[in-house]
Amino acid sequence: MSSKEQKTPNEQVSEEMENTAEQQVEATQETGECVDPRVAELEVQLSDALQRERESLLRAKAEVENIRRRTELDVEKAHKFALERFSSELLPVIDNLERALDTADKTNTELISMIEGVELTLKSLLDAVGKFGIEVVGETHVPFNPEVHQAMTMLESADHEPNHVMMVMQKGYTLNGRLLRPAMVAVSKAKS
C-alpha cells in the first residue's frame, strides 16, 4: 500500500465502528422487527461516539497541517535571514570603503589608480551583497520613514518639502526587507 492508502488506527477503528453500526441498522430494517429499547439506546450512543471520533480525527488532521505550515515558514525564515549576522559585520567594511573614497584626493594623479581600485572593490562588494538580498537605504528627497530612517537632526529648508530626508549621514541597509541598520539622516522642516 502507498502511504496515502495506509490508514491510521483511528481511521481503522472509525471505519469498523461505522461498518458495524450500518450492518446493525440494515439487519434491523430487513427484519422489520420491533427493536428492544436498550438496543435503540445503544445504537444512538454508538452513533454519537462515531460522530465524536470523526470530529476528533478532523481536529487532529488540522493540527498536523498547521504544524507542518508553521515548520515550513520557520525553515523559510531561517534560510532567508541566515546571513543577517554576517551581513551586519560587512556594513562597517562598506562604510570604510565609502569614507576612503570621500576623503581621497582625487586631484592627485598618483592616487587615481588606487582610487579606481577602491571604487571597483566597493562596487563589486555591493554587487555581491546585493545578490543575497541586501539593499541600501540612502535616498534623499524621500519622505522620512521611521522604520528605515533614524533622524539625527532637523534643518529648515526651502528646497525640501517638510519631513523629507535632506541629507544621509550614514547609509542604512535591509536584508530581504528586514532592517539591518537604519539610515542616519537629516530631516527637513518648514521655515519658520
Curated annotation (Swiss-Prot):
Keywords associated with the record: Chaperone, Cytoplasm, Stress response
Gene Ontology BP terms? protein folding
Its Gene Ontology molecular function terms?
adenyl-nucleotide exchange factor activity; protein homodimerization activity; protein-folding chaperone binding; unfolded protein binding
Keyword Chaperone (UniProt): yes
One Pfam family assigned to this protein is GrpE
Matching entries from CDD domains are given as: GrpE (cd00446)
A Gene Ontology cellular component where this protein is annotated is: cytosol
Its localization reads: Cytoplasm
Compositional bias (Polar residues) spans? 20-31
Query: What is the protein's major site of localization?
Result: cytoplasm
Region described as Disordered: spans on this chain: 1-34
> Per its UniProt record, what InterPro entries does this chain match?
GrpE, GrpE_coiled_coil, GrpE_head
Q: What role does this protein play?
A: Participates actively in the response to hyperosmotic and heat shock by preventing the aggregation of stress-denatured proteins, in association with DnaK and GrpE. It is the nucleotide exchange factor for DnaK and may function as a thermosensor. Unfolded proteins bind initially to DnaJ; upon interaction with the DnaJ-bound protein, DnaK hydrolyzes its bound ATP, resulting in the formation of a stable complex. GrpE releases ADP from DnaK; ATP binding to DnaK triggers the release of the substrate protein, thus completing the reaction cycle.
Give the record's family classification. Answer: Belongs to the GrpE family.
Binding partners and assembly: Homodimer.
Q: What is this protein called?
A: Protein GrpE
Species of origin: Yersinia pestis
Gene that specifies this protein = grpE
